Amino acid sequence: MTELTAATPTKRPATATDYVNLMKPRIMMLVVFTAVAGLAAASGMTGITMHPAMAAIAVLAVALGSGAAGAINMWYDADIDAIMSRTSTRPIPSGAVPKEEALTMGLIMSGVSVMLMWLASNWLAAALLAFSIFYYGVIYTMWLKRATPQNIVIGGGAGAFPPVIGWAAVTGNTPLDAWILFAIIFFWTPPHFWALSLLAHKEYAKVSVPMLPVTHGAKATRFQILVYTLVLIPVSLAPLATGLGGWIYGAVAGGLGLVFLAYAVAILRSKAGDDGAPAGDMKLARTAFLFSILYLFALFGAVLVEHAAGLHFPVFGA
């Protein structure tokens, strides 16, 4: 890896927004949403319910855990964040929040989140939350991200735990249905993030982060986006077979899955990520990236609506 150098940031007063941004709020929203969907699905499938106050505390614990992992990630990645234009305005490289303060915040929030989850639910949910924080903050951030082009594939497990945590908080166990929700996020992560990496591959190359377009080229990345999309679609339909997903979920997963596949095929045929790629091809990659976020929200939104609103009518399962 080449030596990283960046200008020392000029200290500026930190604002509340800086501390919120340190927790990666956009990621936190998706994490919390999928956890709530897992919680609702567990209740709907088993008939077990949590006291509303305990459920709210469990969701808060997930949010704090996500924020903790984000702060630890920003602490460790401050050196490369300062060099990449996409991340140079983050709280640490911009000089608003000292690195040590970000780490302290992340560690304290980690402990508080796990303790709250344990008090509100059970040891299994707390242990899964602790592991997911460790997975993202240490395994992915400190090891995989700068070590292998499979960083997103293996590291994607960190972001796939929230629905499992939500399920465990309700029932104290993690059956097949919980792991199906895990698998949906796990296989969604590579095509989602690689679409972004096609746009930012020069930035990653500049800081020697071995994202797939940097190590294997844009063409190979475009192909892998299609491969993982082809895996994701049947995985996303698995809830229909177990009874976890009903007619609403099936319509959403089937319809949006076809759109996702269309984007993947279009990206494969494009020059997105190549040097001198047409602006339209790069716009396609960005649109696919944004659509993938909508796709995941819609899938888990369908799970949430079916089980929380009494609209769960299984297609095949009991």
From Swiss-Prot:
Catalytic reaction list: heme b + (2E,6E)-farnesyl diphosphate + H2O = Fe(II)-heme o + diphosphate
Name of one Pfam family that matches: UbiA
BP GO terms, sorted: heme O biosynthetic process
Main location: membrane
UniProt GO MF annotations: protoheme IX farnesyltransferase activity
Membrane-spanning residues: 27-47, 52-72, 103-123, 124-144, 152-172, 179-199, 225-245, 248-268, 288-308
Transmembrane in keyword set: yes
Family matches, as HAMAP family: CyoE_CtaB
Physiological role: Converts heme B (protoheme IX) to heme O by substitution of the vinyl group on carbon 2 of heme B porphyrin ring with a hydroxyethyl farnesyl side group.
Family: Belongs to the UbiA prenyltransferase family. Protoheme IX farnesyltransferase subfamily.
Name of this protein: Protoheme IX farnesyltransferase
Organism: Hyphomonas neptunium (strain ATCC 15444)
